[in-house]
C-alpha cells in the first residue's frame, strides 16, 4: 500500500457519500414536515375541546369528545414514530461518516508506520470526553432501533439509507450454509431465529460502549482491532433493501434466488422471530411469487 493507492481508494469510496448523506437529510426534513402537520392537527382538536369547556363548563360533554381524543392520540403516536425514525436516519448518517473516517485514519496510521507518509507535527487526537459524547449519542438511539438484525452474504449495490451499526465479524458463517439447496433452506430458517445475544461479543471500546439494542455492543475500534489493522476481515457486505452493513437482528429470505438474501427486521416490519417451521419470503420475492401464481392460473 502506498499514498497514491490510499488516495485512489478513498476517492472512490467517498464518491457516493455526499448523495447518501443528502438523501438521509432530505428524509429527515420530510419527516419534520409530517411531524409539524400532525402537531397542528392535534393542537387544533385540543383547542376545540378547551373552547367548548370554557363555553359550556366541565360537566357538559362535547358531542364528538371521544372521536377528538382518539384522533389526538393517533396523531401523538404518529409524531413519536416519526421522531424515532428521524433519530434512526441521523444515526445512519453519523455511522456512514464515522466508518469512512475510521478506515481512513487507520490507513494513514499504517502509511506513517511504514514511513511512506510523514506524521503530522501536531496530531489531532480525539479526547476521552469526545469519545464518551460520541458513544452516548449512539447509546441514546438504542430505543428507536430495538428491532434490528444477524448477517449473511448479500450482493453489493449502491448504499442508500434507512438504519446502522458497526462493522463486526460474526461468529456465524452463513456462506457454508448455502452449499446445497437442502442445507441452505434448513440453515436459513435456523439463522433467522438467532437473536443478538447469540452473536460473538466484540472487544470493549475505550471511550464508552456503543450499545445497540441492549445486547449487541459494537464499536468501530473493536471491530477493526479484532480483524486486523485495516479491518480486512470485517463484514463490509451490504444487505437488505436499504443496502447497509449488517447489524442487530436480521431475517433471511427462504427464496434461494433472492437478490438481497438478508434483511433488517426494521426494514421489513418484523418485530419477533419466525417459528421453527415457518417459511418467510421478503416482500420482493413474495410479490414475484404471487405474480407467477396468477400467470399459472391464467
Curated annotation (Swiss-Prot):
Compartments in which it is found: Nucleus
Main location: nucleus
Molecular function, one GO term: methylated histone binding
Biased composition (Low complexity): 174-188
InterPro entries to which the protein is assigned, alphabetical: ING_fam, ING_N_histone-binding, Zinc_finger_PHD-type_CS, Znf_FYVE_PHD, Znf_PHD, Znf_PHD-finger, Znf_RING/FYVE/PHD
Coiled-coil regions listed in the entry: 20-86
SMART domains, alphabetized: ING, PHD
GO BP, one annotated term: meiotic cell cycle
SUBUNIT field: Interacts with H3K4me3 and to a lesser extent with H3K4me2. Component of the NuA4 histone acetyltransferase complex.
Protein role: Component of the NuA4 histone acetyltransferase complex which is involved in transcriptional activation of selected genes principally by acetylation of nucleosomal histone H4 and H2A. The NuA4 complex is also involved in DNA repair. Involved in cell cycle progression and meiosis.
UniProt protein name: Chromatin modification-related protein YNG2
Amino acid at each position: 500500500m502506498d499514498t497514491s493507492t490510499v488516495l485512489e481508494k478513498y476517492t472512490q469510496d467517498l464518491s457516493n457519500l455526499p448523495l447518501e448523506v443528502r438523501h438521509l437529510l432530505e428524509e429527515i426534513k420530510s419527516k419534520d414536515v409530517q411531524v409539524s402537520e400532525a402537531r397542528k392537527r392535534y393542537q387544533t382538536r385540543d383547542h376545540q375541546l378547551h373552547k367548548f369547556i370554557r363555553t359550556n363548563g366541565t360537566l357538559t360533554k362535547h358531542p364528538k369528545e371521544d372521536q377528538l381524543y382518539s384522533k389526538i392520540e393517533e396523531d401523538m403516536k404518529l409524531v413519536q414514530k416519526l421522531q424515532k425514525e428521524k433519530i434512526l436516519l441521523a444515526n445512519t448518517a453519523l455511522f456512514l461518516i464515522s466508518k469512512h473516517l475510521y478506515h481512513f485514519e487507520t490507513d494513514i496510521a499504517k502509511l506513517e508506520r511504514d514511513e511512506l507518509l510523514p506524521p503530522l507535527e501536531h496530531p489531532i487526537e480525539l479526547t476521552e470526553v469526545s469519545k464518551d459524547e460520541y458513544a452516548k449519542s449512539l447509546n441514546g438511539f438504542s430505543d428507536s432501533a430495538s428491532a434490528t438484525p444477524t448477517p449473511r452474504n448479500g450482493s453489493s449495490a449502491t448504499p442508500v439509507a434507512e438504519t446502522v451499526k458497526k462493522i463486526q465479524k460474526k461468529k456465524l458463517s452463513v456462506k457454508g450454509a448455502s452449499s446445497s439447496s437442502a442445507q441452505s433452506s434448513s440453515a436459513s430458517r435456523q439463522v433467522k431465529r438467532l437473536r443478538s445475544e447469540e452473536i460473538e461479543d466484540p472487544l470493549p471500546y475505550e471511550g464508552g460502549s456503543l450499545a445497540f439494542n441492549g445486547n449487541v455492543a459494537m464499536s468501530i475500534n473493536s471491530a477493526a482491532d479484532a480483524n486486523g489493522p485495516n479491518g480486512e476481515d470485517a463484514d463490509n457486505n451490504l444487505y437488505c433493501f436499504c443496502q447497509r452493513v449488517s447489524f442487530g437482528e436480521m431475517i433471511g429470505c427462504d427464496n434461494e434466488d433472492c437478490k438481497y438474501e438478508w434483511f433488517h427486521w426494521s426494514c421489513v416490519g418484523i418485530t419477533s422471530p419466525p417459528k421453527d417451521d415457518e417459511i418467510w419470503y421478503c416482500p420482493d420475492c413474495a410479490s414475484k411469487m404471487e405474480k407467477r401464481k396468477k400467470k399459472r392460473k391464467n
